[in-house]
């Protein structure tokens, strides 16, 4: 039974998973937020401004991509990352949800977070924030943010 569970749910390297989530939420997520646009109205306006395929009546190679198409694909993918990130934060427990929302959605500093929530600095960094980031890794479903321990003590990432 344990072998089946290990194959379905391999052992997670907690420290490296926490670091991976910090990187995702601190670096990748802000980029995707900027790339996604601010509101659905902005998105609709952006689509309307993009040029459609240029048609001049001459035969063209069908494999050539239009820059507008690539821009739309990047924007839609960024919007999915933003949407799934917010959903994942919302699925965490109340303390983790509050912390992750303040830190990564409202752009609070870590100091502002632990002072607002009311934890000591050491308890925040040693327990509360790592726990919140591990919960986020469990609830984020677009990509696997976990870093796994393999049988040979090597690590592998789902991302």
Residue ranges and their predicted role:
Residues 106-123:
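Helix-turn-helix DNA-binding module
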Residues 1-89, 142-159:
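N-terminal interaction/assembly modules
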């Amino acid at each position: 039974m344990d072998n089946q569970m290990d194959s379905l749910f391999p052992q997670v390297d907690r420290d490296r998973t926490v670091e991976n989530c910090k990187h995702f939420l601190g670096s990748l997520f802000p980029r995707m937020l900027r790339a996604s646009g601010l509101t659905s109205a902005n998105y609709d306006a952006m689509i309307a401004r993009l040029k459609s395929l240029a048609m001049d009546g001459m035969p063209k190679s069908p494999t050539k991509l239009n820059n507008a198409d690539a821009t739309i694909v990047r924007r839609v993918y960024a919007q999915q990352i933003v949407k799934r990130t917010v959903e994942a934060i919302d699925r965490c427990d109340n303390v983790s949800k509050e912390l992750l929302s303040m830190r990564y959605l409202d752009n609070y500093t870590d100091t502002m977070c632990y002072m607002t929530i009311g934890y000591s600095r050491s308890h925040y960094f040693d327990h509360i924030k790592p726990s919140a980031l591990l919960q986020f890794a469990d609830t984020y479903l677009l990509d696997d943010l976990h870093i796994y321990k393999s049988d040979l003590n090597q690590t592998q990432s789902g991302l």
